[in-house]
Amino acid sequence: MLSIRRFVKGVDEPVWDEVLSASRRDSEDWGAVAVEGLLPKEKRPGFDFEGRFIAELDGKSVGLVHADVDKLNQDRKGLIRLSVIPEFRGTGIERQLLETALMELKVRGMTAAQAWADSKNRGYIQLLERLGFKHVRAGSTMEMDLANVSQNIGENEHVAIRPLQKDREEDTEMINWLDNEIYKGHFNFRPDTLEETRYFLFLSPYFKERETFFAVLNGERIGYVSVGIDEKYSLEKKVRAGRISSVGVLEGYRRRGIGTRLMLHGLETLKAKGMTKAILHVDDYNPTEALTLYEKVGFRVEKKDFTYERKL
């Protein structure tokens, strides 16, 4: 018999991580998680402790869903994060978890729900569509071999690269300002608080190592790139992979080779740390046409994911 119950904080963290890790066995771009990784996530400003549910089949935990409400966002739009262990997919568990999440979001005053789906997971996509979700966005996970990093491909040589200094509050404040200014026209944008930027730079559980660099032109910081190494992912997948977690240039300085310069510096940083592969994710409809830049420096699309949305 299938039952769905609420997550109990302080009790269910090991269960949550066990199911989440098992559900990612067939995913190439996600690794397993551990309790020590979940706890830092809960320290993220705006983290939603409510809305988490676990599906149990004959007493065995087989799926989970988080009807995630961003407490810092005023758009009344919730995000459904759903995971089911592969051998239990397609048995009706996803539908019951989705319906539970939709009811939870509605009760909590949300007016719309979003959900993500791997483009290869046709069964889940069809379920979303049957429940009234509409496709609203596409994204790409891209990879490149760091042996193929090139130079002289249009990078701006007049731009200086300066590392962020973790003990300088001014640097953290500048990343916060740049991030909000650069991404303000993007899908699902809301301004990050300074506390969120600190979390992103220094506390994110995904990266044991992270480095961030400013692009400086005529004494002004006009963009940045942030790269990181997820050691657990690399060990589990038996790869030496680093990630470009964020890169951006202020609007008035785009199309001048500055993004290319930042990308190449980030890739060389990962390569110098012994990485052999770089990974990033991009919104296919990014208004800055970032996908074109990434292809220019050598990235190729490995997989697609879709964002779906419906009114409540």
Predicted segment positions?
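Short amphipathic alpha-helix that is part of the acyltransferase structural core
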Residues: M1-L39, G154-D192
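Acyl-donor-binding surface of acyltransferase catalytic domains
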Residues: K60, K71-N73, I85-V159, F306-R310
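A conserved beta-turn-beta hairpin within the catalytic core of GNAT-like acetyltransferases
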Residues: V69-I80, R89, E209, E231-I244, ...
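Conserved GNAT acetyl-CoA-binding A-motif
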Residues: K77, L105-D118, L270-V282
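Conserved acetyl-CoA-binding loop-helix of GNAT-fold acetyltransferases
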Residues: G90-M103, S246-V249, R255-E268, A272, ...
